[in-house]
Amino acid sequence: MVIQKIKKAVGQIKVPGDKSISHRAVMLGSLANGVTEISGFLKGADCLSTIDCFRKMGIDIDINGENVTVHGNGLRGLKKPDEMLYTGNSGTTTRLLCGILAGQNFDTSITGDTSIQKRPMGRVVKPLSMMGAKIENEYCPLYITGTKLHGIDYKMPVASAQVKTAIILAGLYADGETVIHEIEKSRDHTELMLSAMGADLTVDNLDITVKPTNDLTAVNVDVPGDISSAAFFLVLGAIMPNSQITVTNVGINPTRTGIIDVLKDMGADITLENVHTSAGETVADITVHSSSLKGTTVGGDIIPRLIDELPIIAVAAVFADGQTVIKDAQELKVKETNRIRAVVDEFNKCGIDITETDDGMIINGGKSVHGADFKTYGDHRMAMSLTVLAQLADGESTLDDSDCSCVSYPTFFDDFYKLGE
């Protein structure tokens, strides 16, 4: 696909619902007693994989546009699926299901696409095995023998919301309490939603304690816009001359707003308006104006708050004056692709001064950039980041696979080009 270019980006946009919250609303709604009504659901491929898996375990789920109704069967109400569960490209679905399925009274198996089969599951398998789980393999396909679990006291080796959530979900079924010690704060959508549903769960800064739970009570979930999807427009509006973009109804959970902090640190003109709380999640309208950006250093405890936004932050760095250093981001190597290597390889095609490091990259920005034939590696965030990059590059650019954006943002290109009209 040839990437069309726009001269300015002006207007208001509503990005699709938050992917993390959409996944969790379906999963926890399935385990709750009663009916969970979800509005603003992200109908991307990953979240639809979650729905498919729970339907195969006997959960009645209705989809009507962005509204999803989950008829929960209770914590012990899942049924043994007739076939292997297929999670597509979704690491969230795969890892969180491990936590739920480990404590069931039936056996299951899980696999995904070729990308998922290369992604490490050992980081989930290890703590679950410490709880008594019986899981065969550390890469998909995974074979899970349902068994009785016991609580553990576990220190997370890396900040990972997926691993943390898998342990929390297993803890709902375990004998005794489960305590998790995070090394850095990761996204806490699971904790917020479970607390709203009546789980016996407490959070004390970086320590989470979950006790076995008999019942979860269904709650309605209004899914805010996904800040990871909004990030592409925040960077576009900042780097493109004569631009002003407002992204409405975006979730600004403090564990997710690293992108805003970094862009402001780089000099971006960003304001938050209409800030309010919805079902425990903080929501706002975010406006960005064209800005003169400067390089910065991104690392340390902010990384878990923007891990998915690092490719688009790298784009901002290209058009910022001076050097930007991204470090402590080894986690990028085990995403849909090795995103450190992918960003460096594709940016090199454009003549960008970028160097790969063991835990990130160094970008010397503020120089002219030319277009290129880009490879997305089947990675939705690479496809969207490269589309933003191409806007300010001289000459033509192409994408080998634009459809992979559907994983998290099915209407990305429609929304993108509306801003240029």
What are the language-model segments listed below?
Residues 1-421:
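Structural preference for solvent-exposed beta-strand-turn elements
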